[in-house]
A protein has these predicted regions:
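C-terminal "cap" of GNAT-fold acetyltransferases
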Residues: 43-59
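Vicinal oxygen chelate
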Residues: 2-8, 51-52, 61, 88, ...
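N-terminal beta-strand motif that seeds the catalytic metal site of vicinal oxygen chelate
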Residues: 1-24, 81-90, 139-143
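A short, acidic/glycine-rich surface segment
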Residues: 38-39, 69-74
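Short, structured motif recognition centered on aromatic/hydrophobic residues
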Residues: 12, 19, 26-29, 53, ...
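Amphipathic alpha-helical segments
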Residues: 21-36, 101-103
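Short, solvent-exposed interaction modules
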Residues: 76-102
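Conserved catalytic-core motifs of GNAT/GCN5-like acyltransferases
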Residues: 36-44, 111-114
């Protein structure tokens, strides 16, 4: 990889956390931290229901599996309820995905897809330290 950033990020859009029970998780964060939820949305093609939650200037995404054989269910089974991904906000998402692909970074998505937080692209956890990274296009990002 080069010395200059291949994929300069504007900031972290959110941290995703895999949970078994999104309702009790949302209630806990509301009661303990004054978190404000965007509401729960079902994302059928990913086998999850999810909610973006604002805590001050920061944002979290809680993800509960709805498909017991899906990726998030397997993630919770192997790692428990914990941080699932880090989402960076970027300009020109497709351009960033192309650059990363050209640099040999293993991608889950070579083209953007609609996600809860906006048009997104996923980098495979094997690309760095077993962490799932998500890039969200700044122009479609929910804040």
């Amino acid at each position: 990889m080069t010395n200059s950033p291949v994929c300069r990020a504007e900031h972290i859009n959110h941290i995703g956390i895999a949970v078994k029970d999104i309702d009790s998780t949302l209630e806990f964060y509301k009661t303990m931290f004054g978190a404000i939820s965007s509401g729960i949305e079902e994302i059928e093609d990913q086998g999850v229901k999810a909610a973006l939650v604002r805590v001050g200037a920061s944002q979290l995404e809680f993800i509960q599996p709805t498909d017991e054989n899906g990726g998030v269910a397997r993630f919770i089974e192997s790692r428990g309820e914990t941080v699932h991904h880090i989402c960076f906000e970027v300009d020109d998402l497709q351009g960033k995905l192309d650059k990363l692909d050209n640099e040999g970074v293993r991608l889950i998505d070579k083209t953007p897809r609609e996600g809860l937080s906006g048009m997104s692209g996923f980098l495979h956890p094997s690309s760095r330290a077993g962490i799932l990274y998500v890039l969200v296009d700044r122009n479609t990002a929910k804040r």
